[in-house]
Protein backbone atom coordinates (compact mmCIF):
# COMPACT_ATOMS: atom_id res chain seq x y z
CA UNK A 1 0.00 0.00 0.00
CA UNK A 2 1.55 3.36 -1.01
CA UNK A 3 2.75 5.59 1.80
CA UNK A 4 3.51 9.29 1.52
CA UNK A 5 6.50 10.61 3.48
CA UNK A 6 7.73 14.14 3.99
CA UNK A 7 11.15 14.95 2.56
CA UNK A 8 12.47 15.36 6.09
CA UNK A 9 11.19 11.95 7.17
CA UNK A 10 12.47 10.31 3.99
CA UNK A 11 15.91 11.84 4.38
CA UNK A 12 15.99 10.68 7.98
CA UNK A 13 15.16 7.12 6.96
CA UNK A 14 16.91 6.66 3.61
CA UNK A 15 19.07 9.74 3.17
CA UNK A 16 18.58 12.71 0.84
CA UNK A 17 17.00 12.16 -2.57
CA UNK A 18 16.72 14.06 -5.86
CA UNK A 19 16.38 17.79 -5.26
CA UNK A 20 17.57 17.71 -1.66
CA UNK A 21 20.53 19.90 -0.75
CA UNK A 22 23.39 19.11 1.61
CA UNK A 23 25.72 21.59 3.28
CA UNK A 24 29.36 20.54 3.23
CA UNK A 25 30.68 20.85 6.81
CA UNK A 26 30.29 24.44 8.03
CA UNK A 27 30.98 25.99 4.63
CA UNK A 28 28.69 28.03 2.39
CA UNK A 29 28.82 25.21 -0.18
CA UNK A 30 25.58 23.35 -0.92
CA UNK A 31 25.41 20.28 -3.14
CA UNK A 32 22.12 19.01 -4.58
CA UNK A 33 21.30 15.41 -5.45
CA UNK A 34 20.87 15.31 -9.23
CA UNK A 35 19.62 11.74 -9.58
CA UNK A 36 18.52 8.90 -7.31
CA UNK A 37 19.26 5.38 -8.56
CA UNK A 38 17.25 3.78 -5.77
CA UNK A 39 13.54 3.13 -6.27
CA UNK A 40 10.97 4.68 -3.93
CA UNK A 41 9.33 1.96 -1.90
CA UNK A 42 12.04 -0.56 -2.80
CA UNK A 43 14.96 0.95 -0.88
CA UNK A 44 17.18 -1.49 0.97
CA UNK A 45 18.32 -0.82 4.51
CA UNK A 46 20.01 -2.99 7.12
CA UNK A 47 18.93 -3.46 10.73
CA UNK A 48 16.37 -5.07 12.99
CA UNK A 49 12.99 -5.07 11.26
CA UNK A 50 14.52 -3.58 8.11
CA UNK A 51 14.68 -4.72 4.49
CA UNK A 52 17.95 -6.63 4.09
CA UNK A 53 16.80 -9.93 5.56
CA UNK A 54 16.59 -13.45 4.18
CA UNK A 55 13.89 -13.72 1.52
CA UNK A 56 13.28 -9.98 1.55
CA UNK A 57 16.03 -7.60 0.39
CA UNK A 58 18.58 -10.41 0.64
CA UNK A 59 18.42 -13.06 -2.08
CA UNK A 60 19.57 -16.68 -1.98
CA UNK A 61 22.26 -16.07 -4.59
CA UNK A 62 25.85 -16.96 -3.90
CA UNK A 63 28.90 -14.91 -4.72
CA UNK A 64 29.49 -17.12 -7.74
CA UNK A 65 25.95 -16.30 -8.89
CA UNK A 66 26.62 -12.57 -8.79
CA UNK A 67 26.14 -11.36 -5.22
CA UNK A 68 28.55 -8.59 -4.25
CA UNK A 69 30.96 -8.73 -1.33
CA UNK A 70 29.87 -5.40 0.15
CA UNK A 71 27.00 -2.98 -0.47
CA UNK A 72 27.06 0.64 0.62
CA UNK A 73 23.39 1.55 0.86
CA UNK A 74 21.58 4.77 -0.07
CA UNK A 75 24.69 6.93 -0.16
CA UNK A 76 25.20 10.30 -1.86
CA UNK A 77 28.20 10.11 -4.19
CA UNK A 78 30.17 13.32 -4.76
CA UNK A 79 32.56 12.90 -7.65
CA UNK A 80 33.81 14.88 -10.63
CA UNK A 81 31.03 13.24 -12.63
CA UNK A 82 28.22 14.66 -10.51
CA UNK A 83 26.17 14.30 -7.33
CA UNK A 84 23.99 11.19 -7.25
CA UNK A 85 22.27 8.93 -4.72
CA UNK A 86 22.81 5.20 -5.16
CA UNK A 87 23.74 1.86 -3.72
CA UNK A 88 27.39 0.98 -4.38
CA UNK A 89 28.46 -2.64 -4.79
CA UNK A 90 32.03 -3.79 -4.13
CA UNK A 91 33.56 -7.06 -5.28
CA UNK A 92 37.12 -8.36 -5.33
CA UNK A 93 38.33 -5.08 -3.85
CA UNK A 94 36.92 -3.07 -6.76
CA UNK A 95 33.82 -0.98 -7.36
CA UNK A 96 31.53 -3.49 -9.08
CA UNK A 97 28.45 -1.38 -9.72
CA UNK A 98 26.61 1.82 -8.87
CA UNK A 99 22.85 1.50 -8.96
CA UNK A 100 20.02 -0.25 -7.13
CA UNK A 101 20.82 -2.97 -4.64
CA UNK A 102 18.44 -5.69 -3.51
CA UNK A 103 16.92 -9.07 -4.23
CA UNK A 104 16.29 -9.45 -7.98
CA UNK A 105 13.97 -12.43 -7.37
CA UNK A 106 11.29 -10.26 -5.77
CA UNK A 107 12.26 -6.61 -6.32
CA UNK A 108 12.07 -4.58 -9.56
CA UNK A 109 14.98 -2.68 -11.07
CA UNK A 110 17.72 -4.39 -9.06
CA UNK A 111 21.18 -3.97 -10.63
CA UNK A 112 23.28 -5.08 -7.64
CA UNK A 113 22.51 -8.41 -5.99
CA UNK A 114 22.58 -8.82 -2.22
CA UNK A 115 23.21 -12.38 -1.08
CA UNK A 116 24.01 -14.19 2.17
CA UNK A 117 27.67 -13.41 1.52
CA UNK A 118 27.14 -9.65 1.29
CA UNK A 119 28.34 -7.26 4.01
CA UNK A 120 26.47 -3.97 4.44
CA UNK A 121 27.84 -0.49 5.11
CA UNK A 122 25.05 1.97 5.92
CA UNK A 123 25.38 5.02 3.69
CA UNK A 124 22.09 6.68 4.61
CA UNK A 125 22.70 10.37 5.25
CA UNK A 126 26.38 10.02 4.33
CA UNK A 127 28.56 11.26 1.46
CA UNK A 128 30.87 8.93 -0.46
CA UNK A 129 33.96 10.19 -2.28
CA UNK A 130 36.97 8.64 -3.94
CA UNK A 131 40.09 8.49 -1.82
CA UNK A 132 42.36 11.46 -2.36
CA UNK A 133 45.50 11.29 -4.49
CA UNK A 134 48.41 13.33 -3.07
CA UNK A 135 51.19 13.63 -5.63
CA UNK A 136 53.66 15.79 -3.69
CA UNK A 137 54.93 13.66 -0.82
CA UNK A 138 58.29 14.00 0.88
CA UNK A 139 58.59 10.55 2.46
CA UNK A 140 60.25 11.92 5.59
CA UNK A 141 58.39 9.90 8.22
CA UNK A 142 56.19 6.79 7.88
CA UNK A 143 53.76 8.33 10.36
CA UNK A 144 52.57 10.53 7.48
CA UNK A 145 50.59 7.59 6.13
CA UNK A 146 48.27 7.46 9.14
CA UNK A 147 47.73 11.23 9.05
CA UNK A 148 46.93 11.11 5.34
CA UNK A 149 44.56 8.15 5.61
CA UNK A 150 42.64 9.80 8.43
CA UNK A 151 42.12 12.85 6.23
CA UNK A 152 40.71 10.83 3.32
CA UNK A 153 43.84 10.35 1.19
CA UNK A 154 44.45 6.81 -0.07
CA UNK A 155 47.24 7.30 -2.64
CA UNK A 156 50.59 9.02 -2.05
CA UNK A 157 53.16 9.68 -4.77
CA UNK A 158 56.48 11.36 -4.07
CA UNK A 159 60.03 10.65 -3.12
CA UNK A 160 62.52 10.39 -0.32
CA UNK A 161 64.17 7.92 2.01
CA UNK A 162 63.44 9.29 5.49
CA UNK A 163 64.63 12.38 7.37
CA UNK A 164 67.80 12.92 5.36
CA UNK A 165 68.48 16.49 4.26
CA UNK A 166 67.89 15.59 0.62
CA UNK A 167 64.45 14.20 1.41
CA UNK A 168 63.49 17.02 3.76
CA UNK A 169 63.97 19.45 0.87
CA UNK A 170 63.22 17.42 -2.27
CA UNK A 171 60.70 14.75 -3.30
CA UNK A 172 63.31 12.40 -4.74
CA UNK A 173 64.16 8.80 -3.94
CA UNK A 174 67.74 8.96 -5.15
CA UNK A 175 69.08 5.86 -6.85
CA UNK A 176 68.13 2.18 -7.23
CA UNK A 177 69.22 1.07 -3.75
CA UNK A 178 67.03 3.63 -1.97
CA UNK A 179 64.21 2.82 -4.41
CA UNK A 180 64.42 -0.84 -3.40
CA UNK A 181 64.47 -0.09 0.32
CA UNK A 182 61.49 2.30 0.10
CA UNK A 183 59.43 -0.16 -1.91
CA UNK A 184 60.22 -2.83 0.67
CA UNK A 185 59.12 -0.45 3.44
CA UNK A 186 55.87 0.28 1.59
CA UNK A 187 54.84 -3.35 2.08
CA UNK A 188 53.76 -2.54 5.64
CA UNK A 189 51.88 0.70 4.89
CA UNK A 190 48.10 0.71 4.21
CA UNK A 191 48.38 3.19 1.35
CA UNK A 192 48.86 3.12 -2.41
CA UNK A 193 52.39 4.43 -2.90
CA UNK A 194 54.66 5.39 -5.77
CA UNK A 195 58.17 6.83 -5.72
CA UNK A 196 59.81 9.51 -7.86
CA UNK A 197 63.45 9.20 -8.76
CA UNK A 198 65.73 12.21 -8.92
CA UNK A 199 65.40 13.87 -12.32
CA UNK A 200 68.35 16.26 -12.13
CA UNK A 201 71.00 15.05 -14.55
CA UNK A 202 72.31 16.22 -17.89
CA UNK A 203 72.92 12.69 -19.18
CA UNK A 204 70.24 9.99 -19.19
CA UNK A 205 71.95 6.84 -17.86
CA UNK A 206 71.38 7.43 -14.14
CA UNK A 207 67.77 8.52 -14.73
CA UNK A 208 67.01 5.43 -16.80
CA UNK A 209 68.53 3.33 -14.02
CA UNK A 210 66.10 4.78 -11.47
CA UNK A 211 63.04 4.25 -13.67
CA UNK A 212 64.12 0.67 -14.34
CA UNK A 213 64.47 0.24 -10.57
CA UNK A 214 60.79 1.11 -10.09
CA UNK A 215 60.40 4.90 -10.13
CA UNK A 216 56.90 5.89 -11.29
CA UNK A 217 58.15 9.38 -12.18
CA UNK A 218 61.13 11.71 -12.01
CA UNK A 219 61.39 14.90 -9.97
CA UNK A 220 63.32 17.98 -11.05
CA UNK A 221 64.16 20.09 -7.98
CA UNK A 222 66.08 23.34 -7.85
CA UNK A 223 68.06 22.20 -4.81
CA UNK A 224 69.66 19.62 -7.12
CA UNK A 225 69.97 22.10 -10.00
CA UNK A 226 66.99 22.46 -12.34
CA UNK A 227 68.88 23.73 -15.36
CA UNK A 228 67.59 23.72 -18.95
CA UNK A 229 69.91 20.79 -19.70
CA UNK A 230 68.54 18.79 -16.76
CA UNK A 231 64.95 19.58 -17.76
CA UNK A 232 65.55 18.47 -21.33
CA UNK A 233 67.30 15.26 -20.28
CA UNK A 234 64.65 14.37 -17.70
CA UNK A 235 61.77 14.91 -20.12
CA UNK A 236 63.50 12.84 -22.78
CA UNK A 237 63.81 9.89 -20.37
CA UNK A 238 60.20 10.30 -19.24
CA UNK A 239 59.00 10.33 -22.85
CA UNK A 240 60.96 7.18 -23.62
CA UNK A 241 59.77 5.23 -20.55
CA UNK A 242 56.24 6.67 -20.03
CA UNK A 243 56.56 8.15 -16.56
CA UNK A 244 55.64 11.67 -15.44
CA UNK A 245 58.13 14.48 -14.89
CA UNK A 246 57.51 16.85 -12.00
CA UNK A 247 59.00 20.31 -11.60
CA UNK A 248 60.33 22.59 -8.87
CA UNK A 249 62.05 25.25 -10.94
CA UNK A 250 64.84 27.76 -10.38
CA UNK A 251 63.73 30.37 -7.80
CA UNK A 252 67.00 32.30 -8.11
CA UNK A 253 66.79 32.49 -11.91
CA UNK A 254 70.44 31.39 -12.01
CA UNK A 255 70.23 29.30 -15.16
CA UNK A 256 67.52 31.32 -16.86
CA UNK A 257 64.09 32.82 -16.35
CA UNK A 258 60.64 31.26 -16.56
CA UNK A 259 60.72 31.69 -20.33
CA UNK A 260 63.96 29.68 -20.43
CA UNK A 261 62.36 26.84 -18.51
CA UNK A 262 59.25 26.87 -20.72
CA UNK A 263 61.51 26.71 -23.78
CA UNK A 264 63.33 23.71 -22.28
CA UNK A 265 60.02 21.83 -22.06
CA UNK A 266 59.84 21.86 -25.88
CA UNK A 267 56.09 21.36 -25.63
CA UNK A 268 56.43 18.15 -23.60
CA UNK A 269 54.06 17.35 -20.76
CA UNK A 270 55.22 18.17 -17.23
CA UNK A 271 53.55 18.47 -13.82
CA UNK A 272 54.51 21.82 -12.25
CA UNK A 273 54.44 21.70 -8.46
CA UNK A 274 53.38 24.69 -6.27
CA UNK A 275 52.84 26.75 -9.40
CA UNK A 276 52.19 29.95 -7.44
CA UNK A 277 55.82 30.01 -6.31
CA UNK A 278 55.91 30.23 -2.51
CA UNK A 279 56.83 26.56 -2.51
CA UNK A 280 59.58 27.29 -5.04
CA UNK A 281 60.03 28.26 -8.65
CA UNK A 282 61.11 31.22 -10.78
CA UNK A 283 60.57 34.39 -8.75
CA UNK A 284 58.26 36.21 -9.19
CA UNK A 285 56.53 34.76 -12.24
CA UNK A 286 56.55 30.95 -12.26
CA UNK A 287 52.75 31.30 -12.14
CA UNK A 288 52.90 32.12 -15.86
CA UNK A 289 53.14 28.42 -16.67
CA UNK A 290 49.43 28.16 -15.84
CA UNK A 291 48.79 29.38 -19.38
CA UNK A 292 50.81 26.62 -21.07
CA UNK A 293 48.91 23.73 -22.67
CA UNK A 294 51.65 21.19 -21.88
CA UNK A 295 51.95 22.15 -18.19
CA UNK A 296 49.78 20.42 -15.58
CA UNK A 297 49.79 22.92 -12.68
CA UNK A 298 49.16 22.16 -9.02
CA UNK A 299 49.23 23.89 -5.64
CA UNK A 300 50.64 22.75 -2.34
CA UNK A 301 48.50 23.42 0.69
CA UNK A 302 50.41 26.00 2.84
CA UNK A 303 49.22 28.86 0.60
CA UNK A 304 45.68 27.51 0.44
CA UNK A 305 43.64 29.57 0.90
CA UNK A 306 45.10 33.07 1.27
CA UNK A 307 44.60 34.18 4.90
CA UNK A 308 45.97 36.89 7.14
CA UNK A 309 48.45 34.36 8.59
CA UNK A 310 49.76 32.90 5.33
CA UNK A 311 52.71 35.22 4.81
CA UNK A 312 53.89 35.20 8.42
CA UNK A 313 54.25 31.43 8.72
CA UNK A 314 56.10 30.96 5.44
CA UNK A 315 59.50 32.50 6.17
CA UNK A 316 60.54 30.23 9.05
CA UNK A 317 58.98 27.26 7.33
CA UNK A 318 61.01 27.89 4.19
CA UNK A 319 64.28 28.40 6.07
CA UNK A 320 63.97 24.99 7.74
CA UNK A 321 62.79 23.07 4.69
CA UNK A 322 65.57 24.24 2.38
CA UNK A 323 68.43 24.03 4.85
CA UNK A 324 69.00 27.79 4.85
CA UNK A 325 70.99 29.81 7.40
CA UNK A 326 69.19 32.77 9.02
CA UNK A 327 72.59 34.41 9.58
CA UNK A 328 73.34 34.59 5.86
CA UNK A 329 71.77 37.57 4.12
CA UNK A 330 71.59 35.79 0.78
CA UNK A 331 69.65 32.91 2.34
CA UNK A 332 67.15 35.35 3.84
CA UNK A 333 66.80 37.09 0.47
CA UNK A 334 66.24 33.74 -1.23
CA UNK A 335 63.44 32.92 1.19
CA UNK A 336 61.78 36.33 1.00
CA UNK A 337 61.78 36.29 -2.81
CA UNK A 338 59.39 33.33 -2.77
CA UNK A 339 56.72 34.80 -0.50
CA UNK A 340 54.41 37.26 -2.30
CA UNK A 341 50.87 38.14 -1.25
CA UNK A 342 49.96 39.16 -4.79
CA UNK A 343 50.65 35.78 -6.36
CA UNK A 344 49.11 33.89 -3.43
CA UNK A 345 45.90 35.92 -3.80
CA UNK A 346 45.87 35.22 -7.52
CA UNK A 347 46.27 31.51 -6.78
CA UNK A 348 42.88 31.48 -5.03
CA UNK A 349 41.16 32.89 -8.10
CA UNK A 350 43.02 30.71 -10.59
CA UNK A 351 41.75 27.66 -8.74
CA UNK A 352 38.20 28.98 -8.92
CA UNK A 353 38.57 29.62 -12.65
CA UNK A 354 39.78 26.07 -13.22
CA UNK A 355 43.21 27.25 -14.37
CA UNK A 356 45.09 25.56 -11.52
CA UNK A 357 44.25 21.90 -11.84
CA UNK A 358 45.43 20.02 -8.74
CA UNK A 359 46.00 20.13 -4.96
CA UNK A 360 48.77 18.36 -3.04
CA UNK A 361 50.48 18.60 0.35
CA UNK A 362 54.30 18.95 0.18
CA UNK A 363 54.31 16.85 3.34
CA UNK A 364 56.57 18.08 6.17
CA UNK A 365 58.48 20.15 3.61
CA UNK A 366 56.33 23.28 3.49
CA UNK A 367 53.09 21.35 3.57
CA UNK A 368 50.72 19.46 5.86
CA UNK A 369 50.03 15.90 4.79
CA UNK A 370 46.67 15.70 6.56
CA UNK A 371 45.23 18.93 5.17
CA UNK A 372 44.96 18.48 1.40
CA UNK A 373 41.21 17.85 1.54
CA UNK A 374 40.51 20.53 4.15
CA UNK A 375 42.51 23.24 2.36
CA UNK A 376 40.85 22.43 -0.95
CA UNK A 377 37.34 22.93 0.42
CA UNK A 378 38.38 25.98 2.45
CA UNK A 379 39.56 27.54 -0.81
CA UNK A 380 36.26 26.68 -2.50
CA UNK A 381 34.33 28.24 0.38
CA UNK A 382 36.47 31.39 0.42
CA UNK A 383 35.94 31.84 -3.30
CA UNK A 384 32.17 31.44 -3.01
CA UNK A 385 32.05 34.03 -0.24
CA UNK A 386 34.25 36.48 -2.17
CA UNK A 387 33.25 35.80 -5.79
CA UNK A 388 29.73 34.43 -5.48
CA UNK A 389 28.25 31.50 -7.35
CA UNK A 390 29.99 30.29 -10.49
CA UNK A 391 28.18 30.97 -13.79
CA UNK A 392 27.66 27.22 -14.19
CA UNK A 393 25.84 27.00 -10.84
CA UNK A 394 22.51 28.56 -11.83
CA UNK A 395 20.18 26.24 -9.91
CA UNK A 396 20.86 27.49 -6.41
CA UNK A 397 23.42 24.81 -5.66
CA UNK A 398 27.21 24.60 -5.86
CA UNK A 399 27.46 21.31 -7.72
CA UNK A 400 29.75 22.55 -10.48
CA UNK A 401 32.12 24.23 -8.03
CA UNK A 402 32.11 21.11 -5.84
CA UNK A 403 32.86 18.91 -8.85
CA UNK A 404 35.66 21.25 -9.94
CA UNK A 405 37.32 21.23 -6.53
CA UNK A 406 37.00 17.52 -5.80
CA UNK A 407 38.60 16.80 -9.19
CA UNK A 408 41.69 18.70 -8.01
CA UNK A 409 42.65 16.02 -5.47
CA UNK A 410 41.11 12.91 -7.02
CA UNK A 411 40.82 12.36 -10.77
CA UNK A 412 43.20 15.04 -12.07
CA UNK A 413 46.32 13.97 -10.14
CA UNK A 414 45.46 10.40 -11.08
CA UNK A 415 45.32 11.36 -14.77
CA UNK A 416 48.52 13.39 -14.51
CA UNK A 417 50.46 10.42 -13.14
CA UNK A 418 49.00 7.64 -15.23
CA UNK A 419 46.99 5.90 -12.52
CA UNK A 420 43.43 6.99 -13.35
CA UNK A 421 42.65 3.51 -14.68
CA UNK A 422 42.64 2.24 -11.08
CA UNK A 423 42.09 5.21 -8.71
CA UNK A 424 40.77 8.78 -8.65
CA UNK A 425 37.00 8.43 -8.97
CA UNK A 426 33.92 6.48 -7.89
CA UNK A 427 33.45 4.42 -11.04
CA UNK A 428 32.95 0.70 -11.72
CA UNK A 429 36.17 -1.21 -12.27
CA UNK A 430 38.33 1.02 -10.11
CA UNK A 431 39.95 0.08 -6.83
CA UNK A 432 37.46 0.48 -3.97
CA UNK A 433 39.48 3.18 -2.23
CA UNK A 434 36.53 5.07 -0.80
CA UNK A 435 35.86 7.58 1.95
CA UNK A 436 32.56 7.84 3.82
CA UNK A 437 31.71 11.17 5.45
CA UNK A 438 28.97 12.54 7.67
CA UNK A 439 27.98 15.84 5.99
CA UNK A 440 28.66 17.89 9.13
CA UNK A 441 32.23 16.58 9.14
CA UNK A 442 32.74 16.48 5.38
CA UNK A 443 36.32 17.15 4.34
CA UNK A 444 37.47 17.21 7.96
CA UNK A 445 36.95 13.85 9.68
CA UNK A 446 35.77 10.83 7.68
CA UNK A 447 33.71 8.07 9.27
CA UNK A 448 35.39 5.24 7.36
CA UNK A 449 38.30 4.91 4.96
CA UNK A 450 38.21 1.85 2.71
CA UNK A 451 41.29 0.45 0.97
CA UNK A 452 40.69 -2.09 -1.74
CA UNK A 453 37.15 -2.72 -0.50
CA UNK A 454 38.10 -3.32 3.15
CA UNK A 455 37.92 -0.86 6.03
CA UNK A 456 41.43 0.36 6.80
CA UNK A 457 40.78 3.20 9.27
CA UNK A 458 37.72 4.36 11.16
CA UNK A 459 36.52 6.44 14.06
CA UNK A 460 36.28 3.89 16.83
CA UNK A 461 35.43 4.04 20.49
CA UNK A 462 36.80 2.17 23.49
CA UNK A 463 37.62 -1.39 22.41
CA UNK A 464 36.59 -2.68 25.87
CA UNK A 465 33.18 -1.02 25.70
CA UNK A 466 29.94 -2.93 25.18
CA UNK A 467 29.24 -1.03 21.94
CA UNK A 468 31.57 0.67 19.41
CA UNK A 469 30.73 4.28 20.29
CA UNK A 470 31.82 5.12 23.89
CA UNK A 471 34.62 7.63 24.33
CA UNK A 472 37.41 8.03 23.66
CA UNK A 473 36.44 7.94 19.98
CA UNK A 474 39.38 8.49 17.66
CA UNK A 475 40.93 7.07 14.52
CA UNK A 476 42.19 3.55 14.88
CA UNK A 477 43.58 1.09 12.33
CA UNK A 478 41.06 -1.52 11.23
CA UNK A 479 41.62 -5.01 9.79
CA UNK A 480 42.70 -3.85 6.32
CA UNK A 481 45.70 -2.29 8.05
CA UNK A 482 47.08 -5.64 9.20
CA UNK A 483 48.64 -8.81 7.85
CA UNK A 484 48.06 -10.08 4.34
CA UNK A 485 44.96 -7.91 4.06
CA UNK A 486 47.17 -4.83 4.26
CA UNK A 487 49.44 -6.15 1.52
CA UNK A 488 46.62 -7.13 -0.84
CA UNK A 489 44.50 -4.00 -0.29
CA UNK A 490 47.03 -1.49 -1.63
CA UNK A 491 49.25 -1.03 -4.67
CA UNK A 492 52.77 0.16 -5.41
CA UNK A 493 52.81 2.25 -8.58
CA UNK A 494 55.90 1.67 -10.69
CA UNK A 495 57.13 2.06 -14.26
CA UNK A 496 56.15 -0.56 -16.81
CA UNK A 497 59.80 -1.23 -17.60
CA UNK A 498 60.52 -2.10 -13.97
CA UNK A 499 57.80 -4.76 -13.99
CA UNK A 500 59.29 -6.18 -17.18
CA UNK A 501 62.63 -6.37 -15.37
CA UNK A 502 61.12 -8.25 -12.44
CA UNK A 503 61.65 -5.77 -9.60
CA UNK A 504 58.89 -7.36 -7.53
CA UNK A 505 60.68 -10.69 -7.30
CA UNK A 506 64.13 -9.11 -7.04
CA UNK A 507 63.07 -6.98 -4.09
CA UNK A 508 61.08 -9.79 -2.46
CA UNK A 509 57.80 -7.85 -2.66
CA UNK A 510 54.40 -9.38 -1.94
CA UNK A 511 52.28 -6.33 -2.69
CA UNK A 512 50.73 -5.98 -6.16
CA UNK A 513 52.65 -3.70 -8.52
CA UNK A 514 50.71 -1.50 -10.94
CA UNK A 515 52.36 0.15 -13.93
CA UNK A 516 51.66 3.82 -14.61
CA UNK A 517 50.63 4.54 -18.18
CA UNK A 518 49.63 7.32 -20.54
CA UNK A 519 51.62 10.07 -18.81
CA UNK A 520 53.21 11.73 -21.81
CA UNK A 521 51.94 13.07 -25.14
CA UNK A 522 48.47 11.63 -24.71
CA UNK A 523 47.71 14.07 -21.88
CA UNK A 524 47.84 17.85 -21.61
CA UNK A 525 46.08 20.64 -19.76
CA UNK A 526 42.96 19.69 -21.76
CA UNK A 527 42.99 16.38 -19.86
CA UNK A 528 42.47 18.14 -16.51
CA UNK A 529 38.77 17.57 -15.88
CA UNK A 530 36.85 20.79 -15.06
CA UNK A 531 40.25 22.46 -14.55
CA UNK A 532 41.62 22.96 -18.07
CA UNK A 533 41.63 26.76 -18.49
CA UNK A 534 44.78 28.26 -20.07
CA UNK A 535 44.52 32.04 -19.69
CA UNK A 536 47.20 34.38 -20.99
CA UNK A 537 49.23 35.14 -17.86
CA UNK A 538 51.09 38.34 -17.00
CA UNK A 539 53.07 39.17 -13.84
CA UNK A 540 54.35 42.68 -13.13
CA UNK A 541 58.03 42.21 -12.11
CA UNK A 542 57.92 45.19 -9.73
CA UNK A 543 54.47 45.07 -8.13
CA UNK A 544 53.95 41.28 -8.58
CA UNK A 545 50.38 41.95 -9.75
CA UNK A 546 48.97 38.99 -11.68
CA UNK A 547 46.66 39.26 -14.68
CA UNK A 548 44.85 36.50 -16.54
CA UNK A 549 43.55 37.42 -19.99
CA UNK A 550 44.15 41.04 -19.00
CA UNK A 551 42.07 40.88 -15.79
CA UNK A 552 43.77 41.71 -12.47
CA UNK A 553 43.52 38.77 -10.09
CA UNK A 554 43.35 39.92 -6.49
CA UNK A 555 41.34 39.12 -3.39
CA UNK A 556 41.44 39.86 0.32
CA UNK A 557 42.97 37.41 2.79
CA UNK A 558 40.46 35.54 4.92
CA UNK A 559 40.21 36.35 8.62
CA UNK A 560 38.13 33.28 9.47
CA UNK A 561 37.88 29.90 7.77
CA UNK A 562 35.37 27.05 7.99
CA UNK A 563 36.47 23.50 8.78
CA UNK A 564 38.89 24.85 11.37
CA UNK A 565 39.06 25.16 15.16
CA UNK A 566 35.50 24.10 15.96
CA UNK A 567 36.36 20.66 14.57
CA UNK A 568 39.59 20.22 16.51
CA UNK A 569 38.78 20.98 20.14
CA UNK A 570 40.08 17.49 20.95
UniProtKB/Swiss-Prot annotation:
Question: What sequence ranges are listed for the domain Urease?
Answer: 131-570
Which Gene Ontology cellular component terms are annotated? cytoplasm
Q: Which cofactor does it need?
A: Ni cation
UniProt keyword list:
Cytoplasm, Hydrolase, Metal-binding, Nickel
Q: What class of enzyme is it?
A: hydrolase
The active site of this protein is located at 322
- In its keyword annotation, does this UniProt entry include Phosphoprotein? no
Modification N6-carboxylysine occurs at:
219
- What PROSITE patterns would the database entry show? UREASE_1 (PS01120), UREASE_2 (PS00145), UREASE_3 (PS51368)
Query: How is the co-factor bound, per the entry?
Result: Binds 2 nickel ions per subunit.
UniProt: Ni(2+) 1 binding residues? 136, 138, 219, 362
Residues that bind substrate = 221
Compartments where found: Cytoplasm
Determine the domain of life of the protein's source: Bacteria
- Keyword flag Transmembrane helix: no
- Database matches in InterPro entries: Amidohydro-rel, Metal-dep_hydrolase_composite, Metal_Hydrolase, Urease_alpha_N_dom, Urease_alpha_subunit, Urease_AS, Urease_asu, Urease_asu_c
Output the Gene3D superfamilies linked to this UniProt entry.
Metal-dependent hydrolases (3.20.20.140), Urease, subunit C, domain 1 (2.30.40.10)
Catalysis: reaction(s): urea + 2 H2O + H(+) = hydrogencarbonate + 2 NH4(+)
Q: List GO molecular-function terms, semicolon-separated.
A: nickel cation binding; urease activity
Its quaternary structure?
Answer: Heterotrimer of UreA (gamma), UreB (beta) and UreC (alpha) subunits. Three heterotrimers associate to form the active enzyme.
Tell me what this protein is called: Urease subunit alpha
Designated gene of the protein? ureC
Amino acid sequence: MPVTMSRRAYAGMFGPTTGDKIRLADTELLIEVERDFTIYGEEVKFGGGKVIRDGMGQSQRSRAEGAVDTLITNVVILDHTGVVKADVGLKDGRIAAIGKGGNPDIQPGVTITIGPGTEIIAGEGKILTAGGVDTHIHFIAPQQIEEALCSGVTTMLGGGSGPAEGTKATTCTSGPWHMMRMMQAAESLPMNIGFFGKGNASKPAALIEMVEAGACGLKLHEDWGTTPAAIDCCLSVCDALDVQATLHSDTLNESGFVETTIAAFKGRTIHAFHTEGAGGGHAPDIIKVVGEQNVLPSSTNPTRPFTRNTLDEHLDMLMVCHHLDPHIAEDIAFAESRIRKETIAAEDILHDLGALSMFSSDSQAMGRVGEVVIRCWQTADKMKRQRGALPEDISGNDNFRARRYIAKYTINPAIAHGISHVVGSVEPGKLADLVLWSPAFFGVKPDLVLKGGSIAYALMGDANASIPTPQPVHYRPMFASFGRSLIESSLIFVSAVSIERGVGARYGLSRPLEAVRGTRGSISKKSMILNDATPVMEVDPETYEVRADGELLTCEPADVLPMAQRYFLF
